[in-house]
Amino acid sequence: MLPSHKQTIAQLLSDAVGSLLPEGQARPEIVLERPKQAAHGDIACNVALQLAKPLGTNPRELAGKIADAIRADARGQRLVAAVEIAGPGFINLRLSAAARADVIAAVFAEGDRYGAANTHDGAPVLVEFVSANPTGPLHVGHGRQAALGDALASLLDWQGHKVHREFYYNDAGVQIHNLAVSVQARARGYKPGDANWPEAAYNGDYIADIAADYLAGKTVRASDGEPVTGERDVENIEAIRRFAVTYLRNEQDIDLQAFGVKFDRYYLESSLYTEGKVQQTVDALVAAGKTYEQEGALWLRTTDDGDDKDRVMRKSDGAYTYFVPDVAYHTTKWGRGFTQVINVQGSDHHGTIARVRAGLQGLNIGIPKGYPDYVLHKMVTVMKDGAEVKISKRAGSYVTVRDLIEWSNGDAESEAGVDTIRACVEAGEPNWPARFTRGRDAVRFFLLSRKADTEFVFDVDLALKQSDENPVYYVQYAHARICSVFERAGVDAASLTSADLAAVTGPDVSPQATALVQRLAAFPDMLADAARELAPHAVAFYLRDLAGDFHAFYNADRVLVDDEAVKRARLALLAATRQVLRNGLAVIGVSAPQKM
């Protein structure tokens, strides 16, 4: 039901209850639910069951009095067609034709912003996601983070937040050193398996590509940084490191472009060291008495804040453990005014949550407990040609986001092993990401089609199917099908705002029409719930249900009939459905094609 209807009906019930309560007794909270069975109406409320015992009244009798008050109220007469008492005292309400017509009118009036709310009035929120090490291509786990994080950020924007998308580059530490020595080994002519190949080196073909470009003196640049030119000197490990990191950051930028994700800021872990923020954080924790030394190491008293044991901050060799810069990084988030922060990360980060939060609490700078929030996702398995894919030639040990986008795009060149995204970039093809819309849409939708905390199997063969089995095709086809109906009808949707909607909202309409209107009405509340619960998968679930309701209605009620009033009413319902499909797809970054 529309949020405005929900508010009115809740107030209506509250007023009805208030009229029956003894003077001075507080009114209970009114909770509205959707009945499990459509035959029981549109709204259910158990307030009579709650109040019967305190009032010493039979719950059915009390429910009957509440129902009489609703029927006598002008608000109830407009929005409620029937009030029924069920079981021991449940109050079931059926919405009126006017209430259903309001849904379609609201979609027409609000258009591309139907479902949006200004609940949070511009309150800032930072969503950190992807945050990959610049040591290799983005893998499918990063892809799941990109889909989840970008959709979540969009959801929060739709609820009135001022959203900041941030990517944290782990460009410090031993993994970056391993990257540099890997490229150096390739530049010297070694390859995996050779006696001189470093033990901790990366083996993917991309390492050879970086080495070749470094030796060729090519220039690379990340989207937010200065250009770096290969110095050709195989002995200069720092120059190799700088070139390799920038090269891979640029590669990740390309993958994110193909995926349709834009960040407001890329934050470098290395800057926390160069700007002294890590040392400042450690010094502050020491000064606060939150640390102690043991066996040459510096420990943080994380057990004070719920961790199962204290944690090492600085090892005996002087190196900081990985959660220390994380604590420093989060102090910058708080210092920049982000009182709400959400980190989207793999489930392997679960163990760091208590440590980061304990470190932030130890600083005693006003950060609330439970800061930041986390959305953790489980792993993704990739299936192709009926078998699990474990190794990518490009990456060496895992399937990349680029692999998924190219495979799901259905290009013959990609099937033949050509890096088509790289080819488009090198050819300077204008607006090249548009060429990969099909693959991007499939990857985004699929990676949102399960809850984040469940493991997911990405079936490339299914992503390429043009059938109802393919969830993104099923939803997009609903949108395209409606566009086709309007093309055949030769009717401008804007002309339907004044249509008589009785044929789709009246008492004698098909159950399919009623179900479709109910689904449209649920869109704003679904978005609000998904944002509050940090659950972007709910949008994908809703879109599949909406597409199903549309297809059921379309198959049950012929739209282009001779009766002009009926035709216009059904076209108006289709126009509203198309708008909500488009809005929902926009929230999760998936296109709404007019033809398929």
UniProtKB/Swiss-Prot annotation:
GO terms assigned for molecular function: arginine-tRNA ligase activity; ATP binding
Domain of life: Bacteria
Short name of one Pfam family: Arg_tRNA_synt_N
Catalysis: reaction(s): tRNA(Arg) + L-arginine + ATP = L-arginyl-tRNA(Arg) + AMP + diphosphate
GO cellular component, one term: cytoplasm
SUPFAM superfamilies listed in its UniProt record: Anticodon-binding domain of a subclass of class I aminoacyl-tRNA synthetases, Arginyl-tRNA synthetase (ArgRS), N-terminal 'additional' domain, Nucleotidylyl transferase
Major location category of this protein: cytoplasm
Localization terms from the record: Cytoplasm
EC number: 6.1.1.19
Short motif ('HIGH' region): ranges: 132-142
Entry-linked CDD domains: Anticodon_Ia_Arg, ArgRS_core
Enzyme class: ligase
InterPro entries the UniProt entry points to: aa-tRNA-synth_I_CS (IPR001412), Arg-tRNA-ligase (IPR001278), Arg-tRNA-synth_N (IPR005148), Arg-tRNA-synth_N_sf (IPR036695), ArgRS_core (IPR035684), DALR_anticod-bd (IPR008909), Rossmann-like_a/b/a_fold (IPR014729), tRNAsynth_Ia_anticodon-bd (IPR009080)
BP-aspect Gene Ontology terms: arginyl-tRNA aminoacylation
Keyword terms, alphabetized: Aminoacyl-tRNA synthetase, ATP-binding, Cytoplasm, Ligase, Nucleotide-binding, Protein biosynthesis
Oligomer status and interactors: Monomer.
Family: Belongs to the class-I aminoacyl-tRNA synthetase family.
Protein name according to UniProt: Arginine--tRNA ligase
Species in which this protein is naturally found: Ralstonia pickettii (strain 12J)
Phylogenetic placement of the source organism: Bacteria, Pseudomonadati, Pseudomonadota, Betaproteobacteria, Burkholderiales
